Amino acid sequence: MAMNSKRKTPPGIALLRRVRGRNWSPKTFRYAILFITFIAYACYHASRKPSSIVKSVLHPDSSTKPPQEHNSDKIYPWPMGNVFVKREIGDIDEVLLHRKSKGWEPFNGKDGTSRLGEIDVAFLACYSIGMYVAGHLGDSLDLRLFLTWGMIGSGFFVGLFGMGYFWNIHAFWFFLVMQMAAGLFQATGWPSVVAVVGNWFGKRKRGLIMGIWNAHTSVGNICGSLIAAGVLEYGWGWSFIAPGFVMSLGGVLVYLFLAAYPEDVGFPDINSNSGKFIKRKRDVEEEEEEVEEDLGTDVEGDGEGSSGSGSGYENKRSVGLLQACMIPGVIPFALCLFFSKLVAYTFLYWLPFYLSQTTIGGEYVSVKTAGNLSTLFDVGGIVGGILCGYISDKFKARATTAAAFMYAAIPAMLVYHSYGGVSQTVNILLMMVAGLFVNGPYALITTAVSADLGTHKSLQGDSRALATVTAIIDGTGSAGAALGPLLTGFLSTLGWQAVFYMLVVGALCAGLLLTRLVIAEIREKLGYVDEEVPASEPLLTDRR
């Protein structure tokens, strides 16, 4: 399927170029691409957090003690006193919540946690299914427009979910449908942003660059938690409307300023080996060397610069799902991500609820505080993503690094569950360590590994497969992301220990699924050449 050859320069860039009178360098555009895609996907993740924040409001636990009045500033100095506090008499919604224990129909019954798990799985199942379609469309359509409409549509349906509060809706099907629609639109995000970054950056040190860039996941989670928790006292509906509005604004930013392809702003396709671009070769190469020094990345291919805007590039055909699945390494990493995201998304959707329903230092924390406290898991995730990317680049061993982190996540989670209630300080430290090991391999696989495989040498530079490969890997992972929260909804009724045992099994399976690739990487390090295991080749070497 040929790509549209009539793409236009983004209107915001076109306007600024007219005002400025000349174009920017490739180096400047690369920085802009990293920044805009970072903001875009942070918005995606921010809009996913509200459901985890409001769980304790929709389904209150009547067994917990009512809030007690106290002066929080005497416990924690500013700014901690305004963020990490116990249940306060000043939190009007929480006082009413514990006084009446009403919650919100249809989530306040005995099967409330199960229904909360069902709306999570509805979102993630549609997200997973939509990912496969979105990946192929992303390789076939204009990524800028595709991402724009995905963000606006997602923000719209996230906001509609929150309107159920103001419209006094208690029909389960309404919330289910809103989550399903939001999940389909959310599927446009990840394949698109990875493909855009892959269009502008080569493979060398891709793990470190994308490890840093992938902090948008945790930054989005943190911002989403803080926004949703911050407006919760005005009604839980605002916890959805505010992130949904921010999401739509992000879509406008993408439409105006995202140059999804170098060709759209007058530069060659770095993944092309065609040599059809004949102008500005020396200038482009000089800029590429500067970017390599600043960002640790090189530019592949021997394409040459063009001063055109986007209408003069060569057409690219997108690859099919089956062809993309045949790329060595795609299936093992996709299956690994299934279990990795099962673990990560269980924390994403249930950690605030878990924190509000368990004692920390002998005290219960408020719903708002639980949401704020859960952000520290993502702080650890930021460090984990960067560290995992750096190590995988240093040793040229993506699979070994990912597997090692997954195995390390097992004791980290068990220790957190066993000793996280000792005190708030211990809880924070153990939570960050768990976040480091859980989110590290998840970040590595969804970014650097996906981009590596999407530009695999078997494609010979003749196809666009970045979005499709990313969709296959992340779509499979999202099936696990749907399963984890669903199982948690049922297992939590048996006790949280059962949930953590499930997480341990998931992490173990994720590591074991990479065993074959780990062995191949170790054999290569020892000087053996195993031609029967080609899956690791694009992940270990810089050979073109």
Curated annotation (Swiss-Prot):
InterPro entries: MFS (IPR011701), MFS_dom (IPR020846), MFS_trans_sf (IPR036259), SLC37A1_2 (IPR044740), Sugar_P_transporter (IPR000849). GO terms for cellular component: membrane; plant-type vacuole. It is found in: Membrane. Its main location: membrane. It comes from the Eukaryota. PROSITE patterns: MFS. One of its GO terms (biological process) is phosphate ion homeostasis. Residues 281-313 are annotated as: Disordered. The chain crosses the membrane at residues 28-47, 121-141, 156-176, 181-201, 218-238, 240-260, 319-339, 342-362, 371-391, 402-422, 428-448, 471-491, 494-514. Belongs to the major facilitator superfamily. Organophosphate:Pi antiporter (OPA) (TC 2.A.1.4) family. This is Putative glycerol-3-phosphate transporter 4.
